[in-house]
Amino acid sequence: MDRLFVSTRKGLFSLVRDGSWWSIERVSFVGDAVSLAMFDARDGSLYAALGLGHFGVKLRRSRDLGASWEELPAPAFPKQPEGAVDTLPDGKPWPWRVEQVWALEPGAGPGEIWCGTVGGGLFRSRDAGGSWQLVRGLWDHPKRKEWFGGGADLPGIHSLSIHPGDPRQVVLGVSCGGAWRSEDGGDTWALSSKGMFAEYMPPQRRDDEAIQDPHRIVRCAAHPERLWAQHHNGVFRSDDGGRSWVSLDARPSVFGFAVAAHPTQPDTAWLVPAVKDDERVPPEARVVVSRTRDAGKTWEVLRRGLPQTHAYDIVYRHALDVDATGQRLAMGSTTGSLWATGDGGDEWTCVSNHLPPIYAVRFVA
């Protein structure tokens, strides 16, 4: 049975598909903000990251698809060295504090999980979330000092992509701090934003790799050298595992937050366009999905089943997902609307208009 987990401002929704229709099976953590959920197919565990305001970031794990939960320690920074001063580029203090879990991905080793956070820390667990270690190779990199917040006060790691054939190769995305790449399993890191550009910076820093704002980076599982990035200033494609990027002319807009890569067809990807910067609404107040099937040379604008009048839904960076077949997609919006398609995006069905604001969606086959 196909299953979809929807993370929202007011809980985690588990949906199941019976034939062509999705229905809500269970709601967990009602009233609590759930930033992400991750299913680990290796042992059937489901993880949920919560943000409880004054009580901080929490992590939960379920062994029965959400019927019951246990608490795990949340990733946390080590104690900041006495007398050490860490500041953002604007001179404000940079506290060693996890403000949100913003990326969760299974690793290659037994019990290995990677976690990116708002706060800028990259963490790794080797015991299925029982404990977490800060990845010092990235945190101690001198270029990390150039990162700054993109929509939040602190920088955040939102995308983690592990090469399926060589888990030593890891690509991640930072808002705002560019794309980064490790080829030794996280021991050392290098900037990997060549080809991206930042129109929000002075001209002399437009191409600076350390201050780029990729909103989301994803990879084609079957052809892992092909990656896609939805950036603040455009859409980019990499053909060399993220080492370099080329700009693409998507329509009706190159701005947005989400991008999804077809799992087996490297030339196919989907975007959810929006208008930057002050408005942040769909172009012409019409919700559409843009799809390319020729590596970004041309784009189809898909709108059947999506609202085309006075629609002000924004789809956040983790709120678009594609399943292992490459045919089923789901996306959720800031207004609590959830849509699904079973034909690659040609036609969409509204699953609900009444959910809380949606942060993330993720399929489980």
Where are these regions (language model features)?
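Extracellular glycan-interacting surfaces
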Residues: M1-A365
